[in-house]
From Swiss-Prot:
Catalytic activity: RNA(n) + a ribonucleoside 5'-triphosphate = RNA(n+1) + diphosphate
Gene Ontology molecular-function annotations: DNA binding; DNA-directed RNA polymerase activity
Family of the protein in this entry: Belongs to the RNA polymerase subunit omega family.
Keyword Calcium in annotation: no
Gene source species: Limosilactobacillus reuteri (strain DSM 20016) (Lactobacillus reuteri)
Record-linked SUPFAM superfamilies: RPB6/omega subunit-like (SSF63562)
UniProt entry keywords in alphabetical sequence: DNA-directed RNA polymerase, Nucleotidyltransferase, Transcription, Transferase
Protein name: DNA-directed RNA polymerase subunit omega
Length: 72
């Protein structure tokens, strides 16, 4: 269970829980593959937590022109 960032706060940035999970998963995979971090400091040590922090900060968003990519 995640305590920070809260799901309610994250859902202010992403329209559904499904989209939130898919976006966080894709970003976590990118971080694991060596993608550059988008924040200077993270509270979480795990890639999924870092991805959620980036979403909360508005650094990672869903491109409305590529929403079908989330279903892959």
């Amino acid at each position: 269970m995640i305590l920070f960032p809260s799901v309610d706060e994250l859902l202010k940035h992403i329209d559904s829980r499904y989209s939130l999970v898919m976006l966080a998963s894709k970003r976590a995979n990118e971080l694991d593959a060596g993608a550059a971090p988008l924040l200077e400091h993270y509270d979480s040590s795990k890639s999924v937590g870092k991805a959620l922090e980036e979403i909360l900060a508005g650094k990672v968003t869903i491109d409305p022109d590529h929403t079908e990519d989330l279903q892959d």
